[in-house]
């Protein structure tokens, strides 16, 4: 009975370890071309739950009226228990305007004035030639860049309430904005991973269990040979 119990636990732990080590899944969790416009209401953002691996959101924003028609996309991301969001990458940007704006707040809705720095936990301009308030007068491309560490840097995003990456389990409301009346296409990729401690413990448990199982079988084999 004890041997069977060890076997089951070992195999289960090894399977979990293999899953954690496998290549991360990739999924487009929202594409405005397929699912329609993301919410324009900060009090009721489009609610999305992130899954382990890469989660992509694709959309467009097009400036404030009267010349523009769709300046803001509001979306809330929920990170499940036991996981963290390790990156927020501006993977694509297509616009005649060199930059847009993105920022987030803790919670399932955005409270306060989105035009005040103190309403955000972190923010950044993004685009092919983005200017950010970090003391650097030279604009730079954020395409392919993980924005989370920059958004958490008070010299890069001054006046915010602050946060420490990675983002822990919970819900966060993000704004993606283009203030000028030009159509701006974007893609953001959120990478979600298991909390490192949990993964390490399961892997160690699996390897330890398999080692015990192998030893028991080896001893049993030697015992039969001796008899």
Predicted regions: what is each one?
Residues 2-12, 199:
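Bacterial N-terminal signal peptides that target proteins for export
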Residues 28-52:
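Predominantly extracellular/luminal regions of secreted and cell-surface proteins
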Residues 13-21, 209:
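Bacterial N-terminal signal peptides
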Residues 213-227:
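C-terminal membrane-anchoring or membrane-association module
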Residues 23-27:
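Sec/Tat signal peptide C-region and signal peptidase I cleavage site
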Residues 182-187:
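Extracellular carbohydrate recognition
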Residues 197-216:
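A short, hydrophobic C-terminal helix/tail in secreted or cell-surface proteins
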Residues 60-158, 167-171, 177-181, 192-194:
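Acidic, Ser/Thr/Pro-rich low-complexity intrinsically disordered segments
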């Amino acid at each position: 009975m004890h041997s069977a119990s060890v076997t089951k636990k070992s195999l289960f732990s090894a399977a979990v370890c293999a899953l954690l080590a496998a290549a991360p899944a990739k999924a487009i969790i929202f594409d405005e071309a397929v699912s329609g416009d993301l919410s324009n209401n900060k009090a009721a953002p489009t609610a999305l739950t992130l899954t382990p691996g890469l989660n992509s959101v694709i959309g467009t924003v097009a400036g404030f009226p009267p010349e523009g028609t769709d300046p803001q996309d509001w979306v809330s991301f929920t990170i499940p228990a036991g996981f963290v969001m390790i990156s927020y990458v501006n993977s694509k940007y297509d616009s005649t305007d060199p930059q847009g704006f993105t920022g987030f707040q803790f919670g399932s809705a955005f409270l306060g004035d989105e035009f005040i720095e103190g309403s955000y936990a972190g923010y950044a301009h993004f685009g092919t030639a983005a200017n950010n308030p970090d003391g650097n007068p030279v604009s730079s491309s954020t395409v392919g860049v993980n924005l989370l560490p920059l958004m958490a840097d008070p010299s890069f995003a001054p006046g915010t309430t602050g946060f420490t990456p990675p983002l822990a389990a919970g819900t966060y409301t993000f704004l993606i904005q283009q203030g000028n009346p030009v159509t701006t296409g974007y893609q953001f990729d959120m990478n979600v991973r298991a909390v490192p401690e949990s993964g390490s413990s399961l892997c160690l448990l699996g390897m330890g269990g398999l080692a015990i199982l192998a030893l028991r079988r080896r001893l049993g084999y030697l015992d039969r040979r001796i008899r």
